[in-house]
Amino acid sequence: ATPGFKGKKSDAAELQPERNERFAQLQEMLYAGSRAADDNRSLLLVLQGMDTAGKGGITKHVVGAANPQGIRYTGFGVPTEEERKHNYLWRIRRALPPAGHIGVFDRSHYEDVLVVRVHNIVPPEVWGKRYDEINRFEKKLVDDGTTIIKVAMFVSLDEQKARLSERLERPDKYWKYNPADVDERLLWPSYQEAYQAMLERTSTDYAPWHVVPCDRKWYSRLAILELLIEALEGLNLSWPPADFDVKAEKKRLASA
């Protein structure tokens, strides 16, 4: 599914603060529920996309509106030596959000059916089995109380080039530039084929993919914010009741 918004950039800018506040409120309710009540629910936001799609911007401008103590962010790069000793899902399991938290994956386990496929890191008979493995893995997460929001962030080839060019023109952006990004551009058709297979094989009723066009940053940020709000509202969250006598505590405080 692709989230829709019929307004303009100015409309989004006007709406954003209000929606940020709503998201922050819901996130705090989720966190409070796990601290004060027997509530093991959590939420996992998976951001998967090509370089410059804006994954970091979502973390900063969307998720950043929430209380950081209830957020668990993990960026998945090239596997470390230790990670390569284990199954590809090992590092994913270690980063899953605890109860009451929102987990943010900047890239994810889907690298293991995208990058490994495009670069022939493992043979097809290996990565080909991973689609079903991932589906079973995510089904278990959902059954255990984790709501999964998977976002495929798509940026056009021209827009990616413009964003990479900007990084080369601005000294404050040099740190974000990676020469390997140009090499990856040459593999664009192969990546599009891999992404298509990913969407077809791993979009399920319990963990569907949401395809978000990302050439306009204001749109992608608002669209993903709305996905988060919709998912949290679907949990029917409420503030946990006091586990103490409120009236008695008011009297104690007044006389203290």
Residue spans for each PLM region:
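Glycine-rich phosphate-binding loop of ATP-dependent small-molecule kinases
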Residues: 1-256
